[in-house]
């Protein structure tokens, strides 16, 4: 089986088995919200774009006939729900041009959409520019996936040039750059490092959703690295880390987004936009395109209700909502010196 097809099958198989630390984040109820659903503005500014919704379809797949169909369907979903969408890593098409149409199908189905190309952190400037040209990408994602590469039998073993290449690409390209994790999360030190390279936007993409160490270990004959299935920081911990960074980095979030409530909590934690992948992929494969379009539109309506419930009319006011943390999130913050009391007292009136 093609490696990209294996990834899709394993991601679907493991999807419902993931633990999620969003369950340890509680939003403080506001009995007097003083707003109306009609007043809610879901739009946000992210990666240089104005998005009509605060969530988007994140990088997943491409590089085979099976994944071409998936990308086509995802593009239709994104188009009908007016969502930004990222393709999976286009490295396969850069190595074998015959696979290009498994990615360009996204632009064909969504000609006026905001579409992001995705490449690995070890990619050269020339290849990065090729990736952008492939389907006239509006932005470029560089993914950081060292644990996945190390568990992957055929993966990379040398990451010494990653920082230099990221800096070179940031300087050379003429579209927005997003540096993203692939489900292992980030800490404040990493975000500070990326800021020093000139990066302005990161997707902290934490543990809670698809685990690529788990997926790659399942491809190993002995499956001897199963203990790495939960490697990394959670999405919630990564967002809290990002808020402690010594930079004004723009933060996107992804990893373990199951529903509109998880999106809502990630936005309350400071994300400018939230990426979803595993839930959308699983719903698409189980229920088809039309049902997945309905799910995305349902999330948009649910977000309007959630904003109204706390008295928020836009993302700026949502960032000021009071939150309480428990369990492993609280343990992480105590060990890392992150003050959680300030989050519980962010709303000075009306709570």
Spell out what each predicted region is:
Residues 1-47, 51, 327-349:
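An N-cap/entry alpha-helix motif that binds or orients negatively charged groups
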Residues 262-264, 268-315:
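Shared catalytic-loop signature of beta/alpha-barrel
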Residues 82-118:
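A gly/proline- and charged-residue-enriched helix-loop-helix capping module
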Residues 75-80, 111-116, 121-254, 260-283:
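Alpha/beta enzyme core
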Residues 304-334:
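Charged C-terminal helix
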Residues 46-93:
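Active-site cofactor/substrate anionic-group-binding motifs, chiefly glycine-
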Residues 63, 136, 287-288:
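Glycine-centered helix-coil hinge/cap
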